[in-house]
Swiss-Prot record:
Catalytic activity: S-ubiquitinyl-[E2 ubiquitin-conjugating enzyme]-L-cysteine + [acceptor protein]-L-lysine = [E2 ubiquitin-conjugating enzyme]-L-cysteine + N(6)-ubiquitinyl-[acceptor protein]-L-lysine
Zinc finger region(s), CCHC-type: 210-224
GO MF entry, a single one: zinc ion binding
Chain intervals for the UniProt region annotation (Disordered): 375-408, 459-493, 623-892
Basic and acidic residues bias: start-end ranges: 623-644, 674-692, 708-745, 875-892
Species of origin: Arabidopsis thaliana
Protein name from the UniProt record: E3 ubiquitin ligase PQT3-like
């Protein structure tokens, strides 16, 4: 028996053992305090409530039954009952007496002490000639506690001694909190604008001494010495852990020295100087900076450089040029229609000035690096530019560099940059440094020059470039002699000596050959013969129209050998291709850009577009669905065609054949009836008459791959196959049931006819024959028995179909039932009747066996043999027929 309890935030219940069936709330609380170590219960209390009904047990005398689950929560403790004494009114009177005795103390205005009127004479003169600073110490009467001995007893003294530290503690708590301050207005924190509002009319208890003037009778906020620096208490602390060498004596210090003086920490000048040496020097003289970085107005280094964007394109200090435009309403250059809002910040120049000022080296040593901008574009080395086939005017006398296969940036030069530098005015030549321009530095140009020079260069550069292009186009129209390509470089040199823009062929008129085409073109497709710019995309030396499909590799480029054993294509375009050889590949009809195929010319292969996984799965599922839809109607159609063909062959074909030639009908066996038992259906060769079974219909290789690749698709395909096979099996069962009904009806119809034919056959004599019938030997019978057992195991379909013949050929039935037959055909009719009766006996026995097998859940006994047939009753034709049927089964 126990009570289960837990806090609201706890997860599991704790137990408290109990002796009886009930426990009171008070005892339960005491046990909880004891087990949870919550103390004596004076500071907090516990509220107990039922866990199921949330009922709180307020009365501690309530009884809680056993096995009850309760929730407990802690609440603040209830106030305890105070002890009432009879001396309390006397203590209150003592306090009133003390207040009445000390009512003439100055409490209203602590800045100016007020004295009672009896201390002044009738003329208003002070009776005591004591300085004002001594008034608070000598004039203010000290409360005499000794006079209270006559009025109060010993208990009141003890109570006063107890109350004095408590009041002192409350006063100290009020001083340390927010809002408390020293001097005038000190009081209760946070209210009445920081002024005390409760202590003005309260006097300190007996024994309280002011901590400022050491005089009892008033609180420190009412001390008359407030505001006097002579009474300010300086708090000092001992210099623990600080060496004397780091202390400096000063009257305003906060550390007390052993001598009684106060000191402060001495500043560490050595560490300060060391830190100052590590800082970058920003006190460089203005004369060390280049003149381009100085403002033309104030002649100082530009501060917040700004650029005039509508007139002279010069840079000034932002403040200088803005004040100049506002005051004079015109720019420095003299243009008047400019505003201060048209100024643009020159961030490049600002970054340059900041970097030079932060650097510690001289600007004359790295003049070339002044123009560099610390951004991502300049940090990256630009791709090398190919040289133009036409020479500019500026670089006419220079030696043209030869490009190599490897794009080495160290061997590439920039003649166009040199041309721009050399074509610049002479005014900027003083600042420019004539040295080779590196590939990474070519994008930055020359050194930063004055903004006027830069603006002139910007305006003059387009004109000079136009003139250079016109001058460069004239010599380009003349014929140039093509440099002879070495034999070893003819095959795989993608970058020959004569390179066009971006390593492509030039678009202007080039060397003329017999076909008027550029080198490497065979002139097959006129749309790609260099007329349309941007569509050639091939290197000289390559056949431009060698297709991107796998074919002959260079130097033939898709052409075979001619009778002269000379290669065509590549750089050998002096002879026509052999007209009797295979022609080269041409470009497929593809949309632009053709540069993609030009890049793929080296790989000689086209790549398929990337296909996402979702798109591939959707495509595979669609193909599988189409293939299943195509396969399903074909299978049903083939099944129906096979049934119709077999029915026609059983009914019409055999009847017509027997009516035309009765002898031929006796020799040819009836076609086997196809059994559709799904447990005994064998695999056989496909024929137009027999539809393929479900074993022959196998999924394609693609579907197998898909099924192996995607498990979900494999499961869906398996379900579809299973449902289709079940439909086919149900159709087979219905067909077999109909066939069994027809067979039973034919069996009952022919049983009487068979008995009559046997009786008639015994009465008639056997017809004479040239050769007597050869009886079957024992070995042949055993062989037939073994072969039939083997056929029943291996080929159950043919064996059952041959043993379950239910119909008689129309010729034999006609010969038996026709009473108008001639006497000349009596022998043939007798033989036919004899063979027909023997065959019917075998069929009846087999049918009875199959009927019993079907009765027992259609599980035929494989090794059960039908009743043996008398050998003497079986004729030679019957044996020949059985052997022929066995041969046909073996061939099937």
């Amino acid at each position: 028996m126990a009570i289960y309890y837990k806090f609201k935030s706890a997860r599991d219940y704790d137990t408290i053992a109990m002796d009886g069936p009930f426990i009171s709330v008070g005892i339960l609380k005491d046990k909880i305090f004891e087990t949870k170590h919550l103390g004596t219960g004076k500071d907090l209390d516990i509220v107990v409530s039922n866990a199921q009904t949330n009922e709180e047990y307020l009365d501690e005398a309530m009884l809680i039954p056993k096995n009850t689950s309760v929730l407990i929560r802690r609440v603040p403790g209830r106030p305890r009952i105070t002890v009432i004494t009879t001396q309390e009114p006397r203590i209150q009177n003592k306090v009133e007496d003390v207040q009445a005795e000390t009512t003439n103390f100055p409490v209203a205005d602590p800045s100016a002490a007020e004295f009672p009127e009896d201390e002044y004479d009738e003329f208003g003169t002070d009776l005591y000639s004591i300085p004002d600073t001594q008034d608070a110490q000598h004039i203010i009467p000290r409360p005499h506690l000794a006079t209270a001995d006559d009025k109060v007893d010993e208990e009141s003294k003890i109570q006063a001694l107890i109350d004095t530290p408590a009041l002192d503690w409350q006063q100290r708590q009020g001083q340390d909190t927010f809002g408390a301050g020293r001097g005038y207005g000190r009081g209760m924190p946070g209210r009445m604008n920081g002024r005390g509002f409760g202590m003005e009319r309260k006097t300190p208890p007996p024994g309280y001494v002011c901590h400022r003037c050491n005089i009892p009778g008033h609180f420190i906020q009412h001390c008359p010495t407030n505001g006097d620096p002579n009474y300010d208490v300086k708090r000092v602390k001992p210099p623990t852990g600080i060496p004397k060498s780091m202390l400096m004596a000063t009257p305003d210090g906060s550390y007390s020295l052993p001598s009684g003086a106060v000191a402060v920490l001495k500043p560490n000048e050595d560490a300060f100087e060391k830190e100052m040496e590590g800082l970058p020097s920003t006190t460089r003289s203005v004369g060390e900076l280049p003149p381009e970085l100085k403002c033309p107005l104030c002649k100082e280094v530009m501060k917040d450089a700004a650029l005039t964007s509508k007139c002279c394109y010069k840079s000034f200090c932002d403040k200088c040029i803005r004040d100049h435009i506002i005051s004079k309403s015109m720019c420095v250059c003299g243009r008047s229609d400019v505003l201060a809002d048209d100024l643009l910040p020159n961030k490049t120049l600002r970054d340059t000035i900041n970097r030079i000022l932060e650097a510690g080296n001289d600007s004359t040593e790295n003049v070339g690096s002044v123009g560099h901008i610390p951004d991502l574009e300049s940090a990256r080395c630009p791709p090398p530019k190919a040289l133009s086939p036409t020479t500019s005017v500026a670089s006419k006398g220079e030696k043209k560099p030869v490009l190599s296969n490897n794009n080495d940036a160290s061997t590439l030069k920039a003649p166009m940059e040199v041309a721009e530098i050399t074509s610049a005015p002479r005014a900027s030549a003083e600042v420019n440094v004539e040295k080779p321009v590196d590939a990474c530095e070519s994008t930055q140009g020359s050194v930063i020059v004055k903004e006027a020079t830069v603006s002139k260069l910007n305006t003059q550069a387009p004109k000079e470039e136009m003139q250079q292009q016109v001058a460069a186009g004239e010599p380009g129209k003349k014929k140039k002699k093509k440099p002879r390509v070495p034999g070893n470089d003819m095959q795989w040199n993608p970058v020959p000596d004569l390179a066009g823009p971006d390593y492509m062929m030039q678009m202007g008129p080039g060397p003329q050959y017999f076909n008027g085409m550029q080198p490497g073109f065979n002139g097959v497709q006129p749309g790609f013969n260099g007329v349309q710019p941007g569509f050639n995309g091939f290197h000289p030396g390559f056949n431009g129209f060698g297709g991107p499909f796998p074919g002959a590799m260079p130097p033939f480029m898709g052409y075979g050998l001619n009778p002269m054993d000379m290669g065509f294509g590549g750089g050998m375009n002096m002879m026509h291709p052999d007209p009797f050889m295979a022609q080269g590949f041409g470009f497929p009809n593809i949309p632009p850009p053709h540069r993609d195929l030009a890049e793929m010319g080296n790989r000689m292969n086209l790549q398929r577009a990337m296909m996402g996984r979702d798109e591939a799965e959707a495509r595979n599922a669609e193909m599988l669905r189409k293939r299943e839809n195509e396969r399903r109607p074909e299978g049903g159609k083939m099944f129906r065609d096979g049934e119709n063909s077999r029915m026609m062959m059983n009914n019409g074909t055999s009847a017509s054949a027997s009516s035309i030639n009765p002898n031929k009908s006796r020799q040819a066996p009836p076609p086997p009836i196809h059994d559709y038992d799904r447990r005994r259906r064998p695999e056989k060769r496909l024929s137009p008459e027999h539809p393929p079974t479900r074993k022959n219909i196998s999924p394609s290789r693609d579907s197998k791959r898909k099924s192996e690749r995607y498990p979900d698709e494999r499961d869906r395909q398996r379900d579809r196959e299973r449902s289709r096979h079940q439909d086919v099996d149900r159709e087979h069962d219905r067909t077999r049931d109909r066939r069994d009904e027809d067979r039973s009806r034919d069996h009952r119809h022919h049983r009487g006819e068979t008995e009559r034919s046997q009786h008639h056959h015994r009465k008639r004599s056997e017809p004479p024959s040239s050769e007597p019938p050869v009886p079957a030997t024992k070995a042949e019978i055993e062989n037939n028995l073994k072969s039939s057992v083997f056929a029943r195991i291996s080929f159950p379909e043919e064996e059952t179909s041959s043993g379950k013949r239910r119909k008689v050929p129309s010729s034999s039935s006609t010969s038996v039932t026709d009473p108008s037959a001639s006497a000349s055909a009596a022998a043939a009719v007798g033989t036919s009747v004899h063979r027909h009766s023997s065959r019917k006996e075998i069929e009846v026995a087999d049918y009875e066996s199959s009927d019993e097998d079907r009765h027992f859940k259609r599980k035929p006994s494989r090794y059960a043999r039908s009743p043996p047939v008398v050998v003497s009753d079986v004729s030679e034709d019957k044996l020949r027929y059985s052997k022929r049927g066995k041969g046909e089964r073996s061939r099937a």
